[in-house]
A protein has these predicted regions:
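N-terminal beta1-alpha1 ligand-phosphate binding loop
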Residues: 2-33
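Glycine-rich phosphate/pyrophosphate-binding loop and the adjoining helix
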Residues: 2-4, 8, 137-191
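A general structural signal for well-ordered alpha-helical segments in protein cores
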Residues: 7, 20, 24, 44, ...
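A generic structural motif
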Residues: 31-37, 136
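Short connector loops at secondary-structure junctions
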Residues: 37-46, 143-150
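N-terminal beta-loop-helix "entrance" segment that forms/cooperates
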Residues: 40-58, 154
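Helix-loop-strand module that forms the ligand-binding subsite of alpha/beta enzymes
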Residues: 55-134
Length: 191
């Protein structure tokens, strides 16, 4: 049996007990055929092109972790109809130096969430715009998780079966997408 494909998970919220982090962990548990690793972004210094010739160790670590993965999953809350600043910074750090983006050709998916009913629609679409520009082949199926604060029990476990079923289906679609992109990898990287 072959090794499961690895997925770097970038969680947009920095809060230790964030609902985004809980959702990322629940998604990983519901998608057992993939290996998920959360890549921390909270310690990344702000992107500054002046630092590219001698990049901070945190940038180097982040870029290596993303580059080593077969795919990337973004799980993000919505802040002011967009993505959190820390997530945008991580995207910028990974996109540099010019011509060496760790995102290029790496299959991806986006899950957005919010306490309201629209599930982070604005964040999801803003993030997708950046990722398409960076040549991340994104799963076309979109995932908006609304009323996110009501989905978890006191111990952080996902208690909403409808959401669990949706995430299982999304995980199956993402897994198939990763396989499809891996089969077409030379063409995707050349784009």
């Amino acid at each position: 049996m072959s090794q499961p494909r690895t997925v770097a998970v970038v969680v947009g919220s920095l809060r230790k007990d964030s609902v985004s982090r809980k959702l990322a962990k629940a998604f990983a548990a519901l998608t057992p055929n993939l290996k998920f690793d959360i890549v921390e972004i909270g310690d990344l210094p702000h992107f500054d092109q002046d630092l590219e010739s001698d990049p901070p160790a945190q940038w180097v670590r982040f870029r290596k972790e993303i580059a080593a993965a077969d795919a990337v999953l973004f799980v993000t809350p919505e802040f002011n109809r967009s993505v959190p600043g820390a997530l945008k910074n991580a995207i910028d750090v990974g996109s540099r130096p010019y011509g060496q983006s760790v995102w290029n050709g790496k299959p991806g998916a986006v899950i957005s969430l919010s306490p309201g009913a629209i599930g982070g629609f604005g964040a999801n679409h803003h993030l997708r715009q950046s990722l398409v520009f960076l040549n991340v082949p994104l799963l076309s199926q979109e995932a908006y998780i609304g009323n996110a604060f009501s989905l978890f029990g006191d111990n952080g476990e996902l208690i909403n079966e409808g959401t669990a079923e949706f995430l299982r289906a999304y995980g199956a679609a993402f897994s198939a997408w990763i396989d499809r992109i891996a089969d077409d990898a030379p063409a995707a990287k050349a784009a």
